[in-house]
UniProtKB/Swiss-Prot annotation:
It is found in: Cytoplasm. InterPro entries: SmpB, SsrA-bd_prot, SsrA-bd_prot_CS. This is SsrA-binding protein. Keywords: Cytoplasm, RNA-binding. NCBIfam families: PRK05422.1, smpB. GO terms for biological process: trans-translation. Belongs to the SmpB family. It comes from Streptococcus uberis (strain ATCC BAA-854 / 0140J). Signal peptide: none annotated. The keyword Cytoplasm applies. PANTHER family: SSRA-BINDING PROTEIN, TMRNA-BINDING COMPONENT OF TRANS-TRANSLATION TAGGING COMPLEX. It comes from the Bacteria. One of its GO terms (molecular function) is RNA binding.
Amino acid sequence: MAKGEGNLLAQNKKASHDYHIVETIEAGIVLTGTEIKSVRAARIQLKDGFAQIKNGEAWLMNVHIAPFEQGNIWNADPERTRKLLLKKREINHLANELKGTGMTLIPLKVYLKDGFAKILLGLAKGKHDYDKRESIKRREQDRDIKRVMKSINAR
């Protein structure tokens, strides 16, 4: 099974539109009991999320996990900072890549793997507006070519 192909719970669809994804890496997430119940119910939003390396540790920021409905007093803050579980070598590699290069770590997917919540992070560089327009133009051209080929083959 390829990375990010487990029981998919959430996906950041705008990531490939807004960023050039250079590299991906899988990490575990430290969650409380009510948070994992909300994640299993797919009540998580990755849209504005990002990850940072601070003091040799990886942290997930701005990812919204909705409060568990039956959690009452045990619910944590939906926007709290969550620790990511990575090996020291992976953290050092990411820290070197992020240092002064205009790169960022963004969450791409959240899924379950062997009962544990995993997140697929992308090492990404932001796209300019003209890059986005080129991507859209290329996609439309491919769609037009497929449409013409389909009409030719249908005859």
